[in-house]
């Protein structure tokens, strides 16, 4: 049996950088406003995994109203989510992540993001795809007000 999940996340810029995307620190003049570390890629990916096992979203499991999660490392959240996936008897087939940002440029960091995600999800590098796009200067990401991310996962029975 297979299951598919989709995730989406957005964070606006504010404060000082750097930012963390896909588990990788990226130099930028601004940071991302968030309760945790603001990693939109790992948040979208976590939501996709939770959706695939019909377990809600990261807001339910790691609420921003709980100080326990303030400044949380999203890689640790992702690992926790993946433990839940495995507890349901599933493993990752593949993940596809799309980062939507006018700035900063993500290309120099994509390989490191794929490696970090593959490590956290206990899978081969070939099962992880991360890509980035812009909105051609349209919308909040185009105006450099924030970053968005979508993720899709395919799970299979272990």
Swiss-Prot record:
Co-factor: note: Binds 1 divalent metal cation per subunit.
Cofactor: a divalent metal cation
Leader sequence segment: none
Pfam family name, one: YgbB
PROSITE patterns cross-referenced by the UniProt entry: ISPF (PS01350)
UniProt enzyme class: lyase
Pathway: Isoprenoid biosynthesis; isopentenyl diphosphate biosynthesis via DXP pathway; isopentenyl diphosphate from 1-deoxy-D-xylulose 5-phosphate: step 4/6
Gene3D superfamilies reported in the protein's UniProt record: 2-C-methyl-D-erythritol 2,4-cyclodiphosphate synthase
GO MF annotation: an example: metal ion binding
Keyword entries, A-Z: Isoprene biosynthesis, Lyase, Metal-binding
Site entry (Transition state stabilizer), positions: 35, 134
GO biological process: isopentenyl diphosphate biosynthetic process, methylerythritol 4-phosphate pathway; terpenoid biosynthetic process
Residues reported to bind a divalent metal cation: 9, 11, 43
Residues involved in 4-CDP-2-C-methyl-D-erythritol 2-phosphate binding: 9-11, 35-36, 57-59, 62-66, 101-107, 133-136, 140, 143
EC numbers on record: 4.6.1.12
Reaction(s) catalysed (UniProt annotation): 4-CDP-2-C-methyl-D-erythritol 2-phosphate = 2-C-methyl-D-erythritol 2,4-cyclic diphosphate + CMP
Family named by the database record: Belongs to the IspF family.
Quaternary structure, from the entry: Homotrimer.
Record function comment: Involved in the biosynthesis of isopentenyl diphosphate (IPP) and dimethylallyl diphosphate (DMAPP), two major building blocks of isoprenoid compounds. Catalyzes the conversion of 4-diphosphocytidyl-2-C-methyl-D-erythritol 2-phosphate (CDP-ME2P) to 2-C-methyl-D-erythritol 2,4-cyclodiphosphate (ME-CPP) with a corresponding release of cytidine 5-monophosphate (CMP).
Protein name: 2-C-methyl-D-erythritol 2,4-cyclodiphosphate synthase
Species assigned in the record: Vibrio cholerae serotype O1 (strain ATCC 39315 / El Tor Inaba N16961)
Chain's gene name: ispF
């Amino acid at each position: 049996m297979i299951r598919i999940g989709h995730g989406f996340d957005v964070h606006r810029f504010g404060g000082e950088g750097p930012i963390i995307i896909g588990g990788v620190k990226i130099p930028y003049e601004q940071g991302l406003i968030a309760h945790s570390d603001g990693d939109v890629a790992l948040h979208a990916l976590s939501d996709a995994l939770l959706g695939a096992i019909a377990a809600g979203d990261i807001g339910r499991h790691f609420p921003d109203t709980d100080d326990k999660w303030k400044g949380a490392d999203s890689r640790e959240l992702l690992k926790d989510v993946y433990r839940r996936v495995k507890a349901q008897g599933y493993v990752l087939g593949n993940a596809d992540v799309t980062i939507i940002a006018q700035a900063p440029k993500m290309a120099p960091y994509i390989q490191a993001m794929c490696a970090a995600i593959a490590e956290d999800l206990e899978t081969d590098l070939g099962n992880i795809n991360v890509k980035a796009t812009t909105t051609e200067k349209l919308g909040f990401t185009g105006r450099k007000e924030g970053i968005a991310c979508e993720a899709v996962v395919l799970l299979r029975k272990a």
